[in-house]
Amino acid sequence: KTLMEYYGVKYYVATGEADHLIAHLVKSKKVWGCLSDDMDMFVYGCTRVYRHISLLNHTVIYYDTTAILHDLEMTFDEFCEIMVMSGTDYNIHNNTSIHETIKIFTQYKKYMKNKKNKKMSFHLWVSQNTEYIPDYDEFLNHYKIFKLDKFEEPVVNNISFKYEPIQRDKLQEFLTNYGFIFCSS
């Protein structure tokens, strides 16, 4: 925090889960995207996610969720259902995998293509036609974690992203404590 303050960078401490705050900022277009290696950011609804940043190689991988969904020919809800079924930070001990979930999703798509009533969600179809989800209520509880319809974070309304000036003297003094050496000018 001190380093960011001396560099003039704004930061906010979420009262709850930081992922919720970040996703809300992205979805409300207060920020353009998020930098996180946490795959859950996709399920929270972040439309632009940067992952695997390398300061050494000057690289980062950019994911555009809208383009991904278009390429995969699936809705955001289907995408979320697949991700939650395959395992998140909240249900990592499930005996599921992304590969198996995609196989089942392909079966679901074939089934729905031939069905007149196309209102059945993927997760409901899975619970009625397979034994892939052993505890449907538990799945629904995990799935609901990612629905941020009623996000309440008091700081969000007052967030300002105006950078402050760099405090060079304080920054230099701070970094010297960590072994950085500076030339006098």
What are these regions (language model features)?
Residues 10, 49-53, 101, 142-145:
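Generic preference for hydrophobic/aromatic residues in regular secondary structure cores
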Residues 1-17, 21-25:
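Noncatalytic, basic helical substrate-engagement surface that gates or grips nucleic-acid strands
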Residues 22-53:
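Acidic, metal-binding active-site segment of PIN/NYN-like and related structure-specific nucleases
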